[in-house]
Amino acid sequence: MVTAGMTPRDAVRQLEARLTAAGCPDADYDAAELFRLVTGRDVRLADAPLTEVQAARLESLCLRREAREPLQYLCGHWSFLDFELIVGPGVLCPRADTEVVAETAAQTLAGVKAPRVLDLCAGTGCLGLGVKRFCPAAQVTC
């Protein structure tokens, strides 16, 4: 259990152990991200012990992640290419491999004079937004 007074490193180690036991595939990353979300600091740069409020929030978020709620939902936003997307339940989470799809689509459209892109039923609309970022002349509908 994460408690007030824990050092940042001990708290993150505790989170990582619990998330690993729960079968979360990237427990080390998730633990560090949850810590950053709650404290606003990278664990490598933090030295102040956890406050009661921080410990309670970390504990709550860890329980939700242990129940396999996506990290993206816990954060409420997620990076995709060079922008942030708001995410939550009911929205497919943008993933790094989806960035490759957006980049490949943009490369494919590079020679097209007035490309038209339709992004339907793929989650946040991140594919269409990503193509638009690379091909500003594209007419994109999400």
Regions found by a protein language model. Name each.
Residues L19, G23-D26, E66, K113, ...:
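Short coil/turn residues that cap or connect secondary-structure elements
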Residues V12, A31, L58, R68-L71, ...:
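A general structural signal for well-ordered alpha-helical segments in protein cores
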Residues F35-Q107:
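Conserved AdoMet
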Residues V2-Q54, L58:
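A short N-terminal interaction module
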Residues E99-C142:
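Conserved SAM/SAH cofactor-binding pocket of Class I
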